Regions:
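HIT superfamily nucleotide-processing domains
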Residues: 1-123
Length: 123
């Protein structure tokens, strides 16, 4: 797969930097977040480097990755209790690594999403 020289996630995928691997196949790789925001916080990334969801990721790759999410949730013990998936894109999203990834969060009862200065939109 194509990798970016300066990408942290590409270095984790290649084994250049060690990580706690949760799942791997020909298309994607899952590992635990080093700064978890929930008891379970695993990242699922494509092995080929794409900056974000707007970077022309083939539908086959996205579809495969979404089909892997329940497997990762099962491996992490949150498939039955429930989990949240998040994909951040662009500057306002608080994304910190420019390599597309799906956050899989669980292990705790979650509330609504909250945002900086958020207001619920009224109809």
């Amino acid at each position: 797969p194509q990798m970016a020289d300066d990408c942290l996630f590409c270095k984790l995928i290649s084994g250049e930097i060690p990580t706690n691997k949760v799942y791997e196949d020909d298309i994607c790789f899952a590992f635990d977040d080093i700064e978890p925001e929930a008891p379970v916080h695993t990242l699922l990334v494509p092995k080929k480097h794409y900056d974000d969801l707007c970077d022309g990721i083939p539908a086959e790759v996205l579809g495969h990755m979404l089909s892997v999410v329940p497997k990762v949730a099962e491996l992490k013990g949150v498939r039955e209790s429930g989990f949240r998936t998040v994909m951040n894109t662009g500057p306002d999203s608080a994304a910190t690594v420019k390599h597309f990834h799906i956050h899989i969060l669980g292990g705790v009862k979650m509330g609504r999403f909250t945002f900086e200065n958020s207001q619920r939109v009224q109809d």
